[in-house]
């Protein structure tokens, strides 16, 4: 999985539209148990990854896309923000071999 837009290092204005990409894995809604599938979780400004053997907590820094969404628009405060995608299975638990994007940094002006 990866963040298609915005690009790493990009300067943007709020609201920010994010688009997610995937290959070799299917995007499915939460609750849909299917091999090689899951749904996106967006990690915002996390210094450390959450526990990888438990359901990901929903918070302002861990946004769940349980309907299988691949795009969203977010209001972000001005400043530098880190963004990373982490795929969770039907129960919101990361896969045994985590499926995640590179962390990118954007600046909201």
Give the residues covered by each predicted segment.
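Short, compositionally biased P/S/T/A/G/V-rich stretches that sit at domain boundaries
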Residues: 1-13
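Contiguous beta-strand segments within globular domains
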Residues: 10-25
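A glycine-anchored, Pro-Gly-centered beta-turn/N-cap motif
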Residues: 14, 38, 77-79
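Short, well-structured beta-strand segments within conserved domains
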Residues: 16-20, 70-72, 79-87
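Short amphipathic, basic-aromatic surface patches that mediate peripheral association
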Residues: 21-32, 93
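Short coil-to-beta strand junction motifs in C2/discoidin
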Residues: 32-40, 100
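Short acidic/polar inter-strand loop motif in beta-rich domains
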Residues: 49-51, 88-99
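Short beta-strand elements
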Residues: 96-109
